[in-house]
């Protein structure tokens, strides 16, 4: 009789331990799902930020090229104005 009680007690302990492990597994599985969702959100944010960065880099490049063109035009105009003033001064000095 003692052997049956011992086996029953061991079986009950094992069943309880099994339930605890199943509960822990379910909890870890849920945590994993939440972490996977968070990871997907972060990856989506990172992709959106990368796209925004690419667009801004393209705009920056275009603005730098436009600025270079405008500076060249300004320098050319200043040189032309200086040439006109030099020609006018040379004419007045004659």
Curated annotation (Swiss-Prot):
Subcellular location per the Swiss-Prot or TrEMBL entry = Preautophagosomal structure membrane
Quaternary structure, per UniProt, is:
Homodimer. Part of the ATG5-ATG12/ATG16 complex. Several units of each may be present in this complex.
- One of the record's GO cellular component terms: phagophore assembly site membrane
Functional note: Stabilizes the ATG5-ATG12 conjugate which is necessary for autophagy. The ATG5-ATG12/ATG16 complex is required for efficient promotion of ATG8-conjugation to phosphatidylethanolamine and ATG8 localization to the pre-autophagosomal structure (PAS). Also recruits ATG3 to the PAS. Involved in endoplasmic reticulum-specific autophagic process and is essential for the survival of cells subjected to severe ER stress.
For this protein, the record's InterPro entries field holds: Autophagy-rel_prot_16_dom
Q: Which GO terms describe its biological process?
A: autophagy; protein transport
According to its UniProt entry, this protein's organism is Yarrowia lipolytica (strain CLIB 122 / E 150)
Please provide the record's keywords in A-Z order: Autophagy, Coiled coil, Membrane, Protein transport, Transport
- Top-rank lineage group of the source organism: Eukaryota
Q: Which gene encodes it?
A: ATG16
Q: What name has this protein been given in UniProt?
A: Autophagy protein 16
